[in-house]
Amino acid sequence: MRSKFKDEHPFEKRKAEAERIRQKYADRIPVICEKVEKSDIATIDKKKYLVPADLTVGQFVYVIRKRIKLSPEKAIFIFVDEVLPPTAALMSSIYEEHKDEDGFLYITYSGENTFGEA
């Protein structure tokens, strides 16, 4: 999936910003979180996050659920490089494995109703 953030900001600018963030906040991870294009789930109000390195994927999902005001019966799935990361994995390990060459970790999210309602 193409990242709108990548389309809107040139590589050099993204790389410089990620480096600045990592220098200033060594214990934080710069994350870009965007909705999967064809998903009917709510669009998030901000794309850029500075996530504590010791946060788990599950805890990050909770943050996203809150930001999009997702009701408890709705499912949300997050993807890193189009793969579901393990819920218990630390964001720091996901970052080390999947960070983009610009220094950001790109996460996409999608949803479906777990009870099959339209």
Swiss-Prot record:
Q: What is its main location?
A: membrane
Q: Which GO terms describe its biological process?
A: autophagy; protein transport
| The keyword Transmembrane belongs to this UniProt entry's keyword annotation | no
Q: Name one GO cellular component term.
A: Cvt vesicle membrane
**Sites annotated Cleavage:** 116-117
- Main function: Ubiquitin-like modifier involved in cytoplasm to vacuole transport (Cvt) vesicles and autophagosome formation. With ATG4, mediates the delivery of the vesicles and autophagosomes to the vacuole via the microtubule cytoskeleton. Required for selective autophagic degradation of the nucleus (nucleophagy) as well as for mitophagy which contributes to regulate mitochondrial quantity and quality by eliminating the mitochondria to a basal level to fulfill cellular energy requirements and preventing excess ROS production.
Instruction: Tell me what this protein is called.
Output: Autophagy-related protein 8
Q: Which organism is it from?
A: Gibberella zeae (strain ATCC MYA-4620 / CBS 123657 / FGSC 9075 / NRRL 31084 / PH-1) (Wheat head blight fungus)
- Which gene is transcribed and translated to give this protein? ATG8
